[in-house]
């Protein structure tokens, strides 16, 4: 959309893709796809490794239910009705293909999207990449608890790649 808008005007720009929770997952999902040349880097804050991992965690923690057979059945139904299954929606697989810089941010006390997920994502992503885990931050509160430091970290990261 942005390409169609800017191209006729002759506008050249550089952009980052940035997202928090579901936006973070979306940001990582697109990171492994072919992208317009104006996308220069990514910033994700508290994104999950995959829909499978996140749904499995929620089934167990919120409802005390095992992932088998519910996850398998739900994934199969999703595939039959929507054309995709839970294993396909994987931020982890997409960041493996990402060649652009990415800043990973995650609260160290996040128990909704567990902090272990950011370490798997960070390890899977080829360089260039940076990781900042935020002490005392739970889910999606890193900015709220550390506005100045958060802004500075994002600014320092993006200034390396966007001019």
Regions picked out by a protein language model, each given a short descriptive name:
Residues 145-163:
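Catalytic active-site module of serine/aspartate enzymes centered on a nucleophile-bearing elbow/loop
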Residues 29-84:
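Hydrolase active-site cap/lid region
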Residues 108-113, 140-141:
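Acidic catalytic loop of the alpha/beta-hydrolase fold
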Residues 122-140, 153:
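Catalytic histidine neighborhood in serine/cysteine hydrolases
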Residues 9-21:
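Alpha/beta-hydrolase fold nucleophile elbow
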Residues 1-9:
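Alpha/beta-hydrolase active-site loop
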Residues 97-99, 104-106, 110:
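Short beta-strand/loop motif that positions the catalytic acidic residue
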Residues 91, 100, 114-123:
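Short alpha-helix in the alpha/beta-hydrolase fold that links the catalytic acid
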């Amino acid at each position: 959309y942005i390409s169609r808008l800017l191209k006729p005007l002759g506008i050249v720009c550089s952009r980052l893709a940035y997202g928090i929770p579901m936006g973070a997952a979306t940001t990582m999902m697109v990171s492994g796809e072919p992208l317009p040349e104006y996308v220069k880097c990514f910033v994700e804050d508290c994104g999950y490794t995959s829909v499978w991992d996140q749904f499995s965690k929620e089934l167990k923690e919120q409802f005390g239910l095992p992932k088998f057979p519910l996850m398998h059945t739900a994934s199969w139904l999703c595939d039959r009705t929507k054309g995709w299954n839970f294993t396909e929606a994987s931020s982890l697989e997409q960041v493996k293909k990402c060649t652009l810089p990415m800043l990973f941010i995650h609260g160290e006390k996040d128990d909704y999207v567990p902090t272990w997920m950011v370490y798997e994502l960070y390890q899977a992503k080829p360089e260039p990449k940076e990781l900042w885990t935020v002490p005392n931050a739970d889910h999606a509160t890193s900015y709220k608890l550390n506005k100045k430091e958060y802004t500075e970290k994002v600014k320092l990261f993006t200034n390396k790649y966007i001019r």
